[in-house]
């Protein structure tokens, strides 16, 4: 299974692709989609660059699902709104490519990757490098995106284990043994 992680941002959006092979994670690709070269006031054009960039990543790496960071509330409400629009452009690109999208907070990602929800960017970069056996530190935005893909891989494993452990087994439940058959 191939998972695409997206760390949305209006100026720089990170992406990271991870291949899940049983309990093993393999690095596929990572990078950034930048709008820093564009005129600041041209929001629609920047959102289009993000949308097109995410669609291009999806077409190139063919992920099975995606994981996106949930927007945090910022001190500056205008910045939060702009980030929300960037996130919306990224999610729209993913769902228009028929991908299932999971969402995680930065705290959830940091806890899954570094073991501590308030880990710094450098700690996330170090752990992503170690978990994926990378030769060098990934960039901050790419590391966050890879961290989101790793988080979803771990969450998927946990969900499968829980489902298997709690699945009803025919003729094995206490109510069946007590003579209650439905």
Swiss-Prot record:
Entry function: The RuvA-RuvB-RuvC complex processes Holliday junction (HJ) DNA during genetic recombination and DNA repair. Endonuclease that resolves HJ intermediates. Cleaves cruciform DNA by making single-stranded nicks across the HJ at symmetrical positions within the homologous arms, yielding a 5'-phosphate and a 3'-hydroxyl group; requires a central core of homology in the junction. The consensus cleavage sequence is 5'-(A/T)TT(C/G)-3'. Cleavage occurs on the 3'-side of the TT dinucleotide at the point of strand exchange.
Record-listed Mg(2+) 1 binding positions: 7, 141
Compartments it resides in: Cytoplasm
Entry annotated with the keyword Transmembrane helix: no
Cofactor: Mg(2+)
Catalytic reaction(s) noted: Endonucleolytic cleavage at a junction such as a reciprocal single-stranded crossover between two homologous DNA duplexes (Holliday junction)
Name under which the protein is recorded: Crossover junction endodeoxyribonuclease RuvC
Species in which this protein is naturally found: Polaromonas sp. (strain JS666 / ATCC BAA-500)
Protein keywords: Cytoplasm, DNA damage, DNA recombination, DNA repair, DNA-binding, Endonuclease, Hydrolase, Magnesium, Metal-binding, Nuclease
